[in-house]
């Protein structure tokens, strides 16, 4: 059958599909003829960064992905990690950045929908969600509109679907003015012996379309997600998908019910590049060809072309390879749930991806070259220069320490996120044990009296910009520390690597060095990367975002009754710092928000100290000796103490007389591998003796009690004043009140 080409393939059309001239030449060499318009769209979708990872694949292979608990690492819809008793946790984080900037509500909502599908495609029931959000500076004219839309979209979809949002991040910086970041995380629980993969097996088997009908929404979405923005941004609004969480809930239940029947050979959700990507991935992974008949695809719009059907990113859709004898049983399940079920093709043995529409073959391409043998680049990169050292004695001390602390806890980036997370259902399913606002979200595992999972998401972009290698290490270390601070054992992580244009050697250098740092930290902390996502070209008019390699992790609590919270201290408890005295002010929020400076190097991450100190803290919590615990990160010791006091409603009397160094470095330094513990007075000596025996540095800081945070003669702030300052920034900002400077 000859393939006729009705639309001329011009250089402008090729460039409009995000394909470079040498990539188009590669297509001509591969197929020996000019591609059809539909084929051009298929190559464009499969060879862009979003689907092929062509600029990042070389470096992602260097990450540690295996461990004693890892059941499934990268390459599937989500990672799978053993949590004992025949159960496993299935999780992943991925970005929906570009759509969320163009259409914040739907962009964020469908980001949540997509990540939930990745989890339940594997056979897991979602139990927790998180999101890491980055916006432009607060006084930028679009920021409030974007915050409102994204938060509503995340909440609207997650709440309706019925999954608790248990954690996340929200930060502001001028470098996100033109490209916000929406990184969505989901985790689910499955049986370890009942995981479903996307690799097709067997020739001549039916390829089945499941879920909602196909429309024109999202056509070209994957290509848009692999491009820089410019003034034509508003024209891209039609490429944003529209989500329906109630359909997705039905799809979840139908899929899990179908998976019980033994009918499913392979299953893949339709995400980026829709039907194209899901069909190609299933076939290429299984070394099979796929034949699709588009006339059988359920559509909700008239006169859709083959190009539109292949590249539509309509939501709530799945593709499956089915046991033929179970067809009627499978169809009955989907009809019961009010969803479409259509056999749209079959597996073949010719390694071709063939598409037929209205009796005409509109695509006939080598499937491996679209899938796992797509182009891969070793892009040129250069190391980033590092800022000069910044000794603490060269950094000005505040005139008023109490005022400086209030400035930090009431700033755009350190203030309470209550306004955000109160719009999310944090309690649905009835298993949430720790809600947003602490170090990590904690969710009980259904059916077990004591087992729970801890979740955290972290990155400090200002560190990554100053030193991508140390910043990559720090993102992993802080995530590991936040999980540890609940008493959980960190099991594994997922990464969401957000960067600018990889064709610029300095941006590619940030990426390469951050990945090297992430890899080193994951190896040192036994914290493998089991899934992830890369989002490149986050630039507008040549201005790149801050490099933002978000790390989300999962930890296991064998007994949640012994977990620690940040606000559970009792009157009379002793306050102990684990780790060294603060000394590092480079790239600190004190420097940025109080002194309006971005100088100095990122703090160094001593991974041996992280491991030693964290393992000790976890043992104290699991032995039932800690009443509260908090890791020390942005804002240093002062902000950590303030957050613990605000969370517990109990004052702290702190004495720094034994500490060595300048007071502003002790209080606001952001040295790593540090925690604040509170322990009952009668076990304080025992805990300190154990720390000494384990070679863990510690400092006795003071006592819990009263209604104020008192630090020597430097700070004396009533908890209520701290709370009022901490809680007011976000509502004031969203209602357009007060001073809204980000810095």
Curated annotation (Swiss-Prot):
Subcellular location per the Swiss-Prot or TrEMBL entry: Cytoplasm
Positions that bind ATP: 53, 92, 495, 532
Binding site for substrate: 95-98, 117, 241, 313-315, 535
Catalysed reactions, semicolon-separated: N(2)-formyl-N(1)-(5-phospho-beta-D-ribosyl)glycinamide + L-glutamine + ATP + H2O = 2-formamido-N(1)-(5-O-phospho-beta-D-ribosyl)acetamidine + L-glutamate + ADP + phosphate + H(+)
Listed pathway(s): Purine metabolism; IMP biosynthesis via de novo pathway; 5-amino-1-(5-phospho-D-ribosyl)imidazole from N(2)-formyl-N(1)-(5-phospho-D-ribosyl)glycinamide: step 1/2
Designated gene of the protein: purL
Gene Ontology MF terms in the entry: ATP binding; magnesium ion binding; phosphoribosylformylglycinamidine synthase activity
Organism the protein comes from: Rhizobium etli (strain ATCC 51251 / DSM 11541 / JCM 21823 / NBRC 15573 / CFN 42)
EC primary class: ligase
Coiled-coil ranges per UniProt: none
Binding site for Mg(2+) 1: 94, 533
Family per similarity comment: Belongs to the FGAMS family.
Residues at the active site: 50, 96
Amino acids binding Mg(2+) 2: 118, 269
Designated name of the protein: Phosphoribosylformylglycinamidine synthase subunit PurL
Keyword Ribosomal protein: no
